Amino acid sequence: MAYSSGFNPHPRISYANASPTSAASEAEYLELGLSDRCDPAKVGAALDEVLGPGLDVVEVAEVLPGAASLNDLLAASAWRIELGQSDPEALASAVGQLLSRDELVVQRMTKTGLRDFDVRGAIVELRVTPEGALLFLGRHEVPLVRPDDVVTALRLLVPGLGGERPAMLTRLGQGVVAEPHAAGTLVDPFSGELAQLF
């Protein structure tokens, strides 16, 4: 493991686009700085040994000099959002209303105070499944629109949508939006291949 320099060295670990607190995820990424070149498979196996149940290393890749940064490769996320007791027709109506707008601003409290987020501007795709869940594909823009901001926007359009309980959020994948965009897909950050996420 490589460490930072200075009076208080710490491990060189950076998390790219960490998901919000309480969200589940199938696609979290981190970069580790190592002091020596190591076999990626051995690094993955060593991490798997010490991670808790439910935290699995799926893939490890070596970053070569001059390669794109992880943040550049993770420019969008695909999410499944479950609101609970939602009428699929009301949900579809709210989605239609949101997608028909050029802008829909919600507010969220951040460390620096109340901040505005244009939910509509970040949406690449938003649709309702037959089971009444939402599938949301959004760009990682500044400021970052999170899936709970999408829920807030939908509840502004249709008050009481899904009841009062917090939505269950699951990140399905991260990558880059291909142009032209194919529904439910992102470019995989490791392989560069188009990945079907929903």
Label the model's feature ranges.
Residues 1, 51-56, 159-163:
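Short secondary-structure junctions
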Residues 26-80:
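Ordered, amphipathic secondary-structure segments that act as subunit-interaction surfaces
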Residues 10-19, 60-68, 112-128:
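Short amphipathic beta-strand starts and helix->beta connectors
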Residues 35-40, 86-88, 140-143:
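Helix N-cap motif at beta-to-alpha junctions
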Residues 3-35, 64-65:
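Short, charge-patterned binding micro-sites
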